[in-house]
């Protein structure tokens, strides 16, 4: 998998970081809204 060079590492890190921030944001927002307790 390493050394193929098809997907830049910075692109993976950027997409992964945005996904993590989005999930955390939804979870925190859900906690304040009372939805996070059901998760």
Swiss-Prot record:
SUPFAM superfamilies: Photosystem II reaction center protein J, PsbJ. Gene3D superfamilies: 6.10.250.2070. It is found in: Plastid, Chloroplast thylakoid membrane. GO terms for biological process: photosynthesis. It comes from the Eukaryota. Its main location: plastid. GO terms for cellular component: chloroplast thylakoid membrane; photosystem II reaction center. The keyword Transferase does not apply. The chain crosses the membrane at residues 9-29. It is a single-pass membrane protein. Keywords: Chloroplast, Membrane, Photosynthesis, Photosystem II, Plastid, Reaction center, Thylakoid, Transmembrane, Transmembrane helix. One of the components of the core complex of photosystem II (PSII). PSII is a light-driven water:plastoquinone oxidoreductase that uses light energy to abstract electrons from H(2)O, generating O(2) and a proton gradient subsequently used for ATP formation. It consists of a core antenna complex that captures photons, and an electron transfer chain that converts photonic excitation into a charge separation. PSII is composed of 1 copy each of membrane proteins PsbA, PsbB, PsbC, PsbD, PsbE, PsbF, PsbH, PsbI, PsbJ, PsbK, PsbL, PsbM, PsbT, PsbX, PsbY, PsbZ, Psb30/Ycf12, at least 3 peripheral proteins of the oxygen-evolving complex and a large number of cofactors. It forms dimeric complexes. HAMAP family: PSII_PsbJ. Belongs to the PsbJ family. This is Photosystem II reaction center protein J. It comes from Gracilaria tenuistipitata var. liui.
